[in-house]
Every structure is written in C-alpha cells, then in structure tokens.
Amino acid sequence: MDTISQMLEEAAQEHGPRLALKMRKGLCLEKYTYKDLWRKAQCTAGLLQNRGMEKGERVLLWAPNSPSWVIAYLGVLIGGGVVVPLDVQSTPHFVAKVVAQTEPVLALLSTSIPEAARTPSVPIAYLEDLPHLLRREKAVFQQPQIQGQDLAEIMYTSGTTGEPKGVMLTHRNLVYNVETGRQMIPVNPDSKALSLLPLSHIYAQFAGLLSPLHCGASIIYLPSRQPNTLLRVLRREGITTVALVPQLLQLIMSHIERGVERRGAADLWRFMHRLAPRLPMTVRRILFRSVHRELGGCLQFLLCGGAYLDPSLAQKWESLGIPILQGYGMTETAAMVTYDTLYHRRLGTVGRPPPGQQVEIAPDGEILVRGENVFIGYWRNANATKQTFRDGWYCTGDLGYLDSDGYLHFKGRKKNLIVLADGMNVYPEDIENCLNLRPEIKEAVVIDLPKNGGLVEVHAVILVADPENVEQAVRETNRLLASHQQVRGFTVWSGEDFPRTHTLKVKRHEVLDVLAAADKFAEEQPEIPSRQIDSDLRHLVAKIAGLPREDIGPQSVLGLDLGLDSLSIVELLCLIEEEMSISVEEGQLPAQATVGDLEAILADVERLEEPTIFPDWPAGLAARATRILLQRVLVDPLLAFLCPTQVKGLENLVDISGPALFIANHTSHLDTPVVLKVLLRRYGSRLSAAAAADYWFANPLLGNLIALLFNAFPMARQGNARPCMEHIVDLVDRGWSVLIFPEGTRSPNGELQPFKAGVGLLAVELGIPVVPIKLSGLQQVLPKGSWLPRRGPVTVTIGASLRLLPGMDYVQATQQLEREIRRL
C-alpha cells in the first residue's frame, strides 16, 4: 500500500458498513460509513476533475473540521491533486502569499471564512454546497495513475508574516507513518476516536483522520473545544481515545479539578493522587471511577503531541488510570518520529523510534531523522531544502538525547522557533519585522516567555523610540497578525541596547534570563465598575490569567494585556458557564476582544435554565420488554375495544430503512397509543413519542408511567425547546424513530391547527424520511377536555415519506409538511 487512495479503498472493502465519520453541529447530524466515504470521495474527485483539477494541480482547502472537510481532502488526493490545507485563523496576507506560491486551480472554502479574507484570483467552491453540487453535476470519476512518490500535500507550518515555506509530503510519506502508527498505537475497528485538533495540521491528520481510518475506527468531530461540550460527547459517544495537545489536557484536568473543589473533596483528591502511582492501572480506574463516569467510562488512552508536555500533568492523568501516549515529530516528518506504546512508555520522554525509523543525535545535540516519512523538500525553495538536509539526514533543529533504552529525551529548540502549548508554531523574526516597522519602536526581540505548567507566551522585548505610545504600537501590530502570533505581553528594555554577539545578533537567551529574573512586568489598569456581573467576571479572568483582580480593567485586551491564548479563552468561557450559568461561544468574541467586550456580551445573554433531564431507562432492555408486554396485554386490547382502527397506507413504510420522523395531527390523548399500536409490528419498541412537558411530566409519577408505556419524553411547548430537539437528534443518532405532533397541542374542534416552526427545522436538519400521518375519529372517542372515552371507529392514514432538501428554508419546510397532512 503506497497511496491514500489504496488505503481508503481497502478500508471501504474491509469495513464498508461500519461508521467512519460523524459530527453533530446544532441539530445537524452528519454520518458516513466507510462505504459512503469511499463513494463520496470518488464523486468529489470527479467533480474536481470537471472543475479543472488534473494530476499534480494544487487545491486550496480552507475550512473548519467537518466530515465535508475530510471528503474534500480525500477527493483531491484520490483524484491526483495536491491538497494545500490552511488553518482557519490564517490571515489574508498569509493566504495571498500561499496562493502566489502554489498557484491553485481551485479553492475549497467554508462560508464561515470571512469574505474579506477570500482570494478573488482563484475559483471558489464552498464545502457547504458540496452535497448539492454532487447531486446536480453527477460527475464521472476518472481514476488517475498515482504512485507513492507523487506529491499529496503542501503544508505550510502555521502562519508566518515572512515568506512561508511549504512542506512537500508524498503519498508514501503519509502512508508509511499510518502503517507504522498502526503497529504502535492500539486503535482497532471497535475504537471511537474524538478529533479536536485542526485538520490543517499534520498531527491532527495523522491522529484524528488517517490512522483511525486505516484501522477501521469511527471518528467523531466536534465543533467546540469547551470542556462541558467535550465531556458530553465523551459520554454520549463512548469515546475510547482522543488526540490532544498539552494545553487541552490541562484544560480538561482543570475543569475536573474545579468540580472536585466545588464538591469540597480537594483533600481526598490529593490523597488519592498520592496513593494512585503505587497501584496497578486497573485499580486506579476503580479508585477514580467517578471521574471515568464523567469522561464517558470508555476512555482507554490519550494521545498527546505537538508541544512539550509537563511530566507532572502527564502523571495526573496516569494516576487516574488513563495512559498518556506521547510522541515526537513535525510537519517535515509527516507527523511522527517517536512513539510511546501502551506497555512501553516513560514519563519525561517522547517515546522510542519504531522499526525502520532512524534517529541520530549530532555532536552538538541536534536530533537528526531519516526514513520514509521524511518530506522531499520545501515547495519551490531549493535553498531552504538544501540547508535542512545533511548527508541524507533531516536536521530537525531540536536538541535531545537517546537514553540507553532508546527513549528520546527532548531538550529544547536549537532554532528560534516558538512552539505554543496548543502545538502552533510561531516564527519570532516575522513578528519582529512587523514591530520594527512601527516608528514608536527602535527594535524588538520576540521570545517565548515561560509561564506556569511549562507553558510559554509570545512576549516582545522592546527598545522604544516613543515610550508614550508603545502599547498602542503593539496593539496595532497585533491587528496584522494571526491569532496564534499575537504578542501576549511586552517589556520595555531598560538598557541602551540589547546584548549582542560580535556579528551584532541579539543574544536572545541573555534577554530571556533578564526577564526571568524580574519580579513583575505589568502596568496598572483602570478600576472595574462595581456591577455584579463585572465583579464576577473580573474574578474569573484573574483566575485564568494568574493576575491580581485590580490589574484587570474593561479595556484590558484578553490577548495582549492578559496573556490569554485561544485555549485559555476557551477555559475562561468554560469557567463562566460553570460559575455564572451563562454560555458564550468563541465565535461570539470580536478580534482583539477586551474584558469590556466580554462584559457586554454577558449582559445581553440570558442565564442558562436548569437542564431538562431525559432519562435513559425507558430505552433500556428491561423497559422495552415491559413496554411490549403491557402494550399487547393491556393497551392494545383496550384500544381494540374503544376504537376499532382502519389503517391505510401501510405500504408507504416498506421502503423506509433506518429511523424516520413521524408527524401526526393531534386531536386526542389517545393519538399516541393508537399510532404506536399501528407502528408496533414494524418498529417494535424503537419508537419514541414527544409529550407536553408541562402537562404530562409536571407530575413525576405520571411522567414515569407514560415514559414506560409509550417511551414518551418531555417536549417544551413554551420557552427553550432546544434541549428537546437535541434529544430528538440523540434518539435518531441511536437508530430510534420519533413521533411528534407539530400543532403543539390538541385541536379543540378536530380541525388541523397551524404547525410550529420547529418541525421544519427538525425535518431539514435530521435528513431522515418524514412520514405524515392523518388521524380521524379520535376526536369523537376522547375529545379535548374529556376524560371519559366513547366507543367509535378510527382511521389512520399513512402518507408517502418525503425527504426535505438540505438548506431548505425552515418556514417553507413547515408549510410543506402541513400541506402533506391536509392532503391525506
């Protein structure tokens, strides 16, 4: 196996019906089996070939993670094209340079990319339009002859403001690492991998896409990095492994520890952590079983790479009974060079080279690498390529050593490159060039200033020409930089000049030593207003930033003034949700957001209501068996006596496979049991019905009774209906069909009432067959306002199923469904 096309075809043949990709975003659910994925990738390749992509042509891919991103990526590769993936946070200036270098024939973008950032010189297709384009054009895929040595990707290692370098990776580079990883990492067809990291980066592609696909695992993509969302998905999906960077590991651990503190169990937590290292892993999992329940109960191990991992943080996770498998690599090695394995790992190291991977240590301590995973050079940059290789060895620019057991110890970087805790690379010279253009600044040196927990921040040390306006100069410069390049703090250098070498280069290590010895580099901020929301927020911001509350004001920029990077902001938003019951997503924050901006957002957002509880027990085996028994011996005979039922249109159910959304008019309390009786033979007990939360579930005893008899769940008729809709998505995702009454309440006279708009939203976003049902006669048997039924005939008419097109207007969808019921 030498190409991604061969790998994907083999996976489709071996694991065809298994789930390959899945993502839930709001009420939209995307799922693809391996067979679906192979077919969609081929169709996409044909579409791209129709749009002018030939073998070796470059295609820009600029979008957030999603199954559509994966399909587009694979479509380019199996069609013979070369993918140029871009980070969603790339600046327009950087993208323009990449476009100029690679000359792509097409750009595949998400509509979420700001319009001002898009390049007008390249034809654009939007990933959101991909399903529609595939249906409309029905392109025929022409299989090109692809070899292992053919170029697969040109990856630009993060955004730089200088001349970016494109790393050329072949199909064989990618496949070799995937094959090697399969021997080292225990992923199999029963694994469920959660992919959080941006797929525009090679580590995420390896650990969150290619490696799981090669093993037949299921990959779950997540649109949010907030711990609350992450933990919900871990529980709901039964996730077995996650690939993370150290900062995300710390983010989740901090979330867990805050919960421990709120429960008043901090002393017990510390005692258990002191005890755990002496115990076997199985016993540790029992000791921390409550944490494992919170993490879904299925987590087997975590993968960590992309940046330095503090051994003390790794030990915390190991103490929980969750192994941390570290690795070392970079874009130029198609992700991985060394690996930990489940049974051979050593804290403080980054693993061992697998068989076939050559690692040497140069006399000066530099790590040298050779193997089939090493890139072939930089795109159209022979000089940079030549400087990177020495006698066939790739010079990593990293320092380290191999111990007697072959474990690699990473000691630091030989070059000036800054690697942030989220795995993003920052080139100091690029930021320095921008800062040095400002008239207020004589010269700037950008360094990685150490913070607590082994983290670093991008910090500028400045020789000033205009001390009064230096802060404004830094702020203005930040507007030109990508989010990971932001200067998080700065220091005015007190001397006349920086320490320099005899060739006048700044001695960065001496500058860093001076800063490390100083006690504090901060200026006073304006006082915080006394409103409670501001006071609460100031406390939480101070906690995340590690600063005194009095140093934080409404004009404090979260990045520049407080040193918060993107993941620190995610942690802050998580803390706000936990402590203030207000949910804010990253996307709601403006660029260069200040504390005042966040205060304004919080003031406009309603506090979260108590979450609606949807118990799992009605879907359990015991409840389902009891339900079938009660329906057959009690409910069905009673209905047969009260309302002899004629059923029309059963043939419309024959061609429906999988879950469906049943919609019916609502005239009586008997509507649900009658419909369930009609559908029982075909759908058994895998059918759930919505019932008015305020009517049936206000009394717990009554709510539990109808949950048992009819597998009913509460649906809010007033207020926030979103939790209920998300529960419906959960049911459909698990293969259940759902019955709802779109009128929202019983008709007082038997006439069809206008439908609530939510049914259109559900029908469009779920993407499953919608089956209309017309009930006649029940209004005479048990009308609204009566509890004493009268015997009478009933007719149930089942209409033909329909699927609503993705992207259809919800109001129009609702109107169409109402018309379907009226026609019956």
Segments predicted by a language model, with ranges:
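Conserved AMP-binding/adenylate-forming core of the ANL superfamily
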Residues: 21-66, 70-74, 91-96, 145, ...
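Non-catalytic C-terminal accessory region of glycerolipid acyltransferases
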Residues: 470, 516, 722-824
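Conserved AMP-binding/adenylate-forming
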Residues: 242, 283-408, 414-417, 431-432, ...
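Conserved C-terminal "lid"/linker of ANL adenylate-forming enzymes
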Residues: 445-448, 478-530
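AMP-binding/adenylate-forming catalytic core of the ANL superfamily
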Residues: 90, 107, 361, 371, ...
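Conserved AMP-binding/adenylation subdomain of ANL enzymes
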Residues: 175-192, 199-289
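Conserved ATP-dependent adenylate/AMP-binding module captured primarily in the ANL superfamily
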Residues: 88-116, 133-137, 177-194, 226-240
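Conserved pre-ATP/AMP-binding loop-to-beta segment of ANL
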Residues: 16-19, 138-156, 163, 186-192
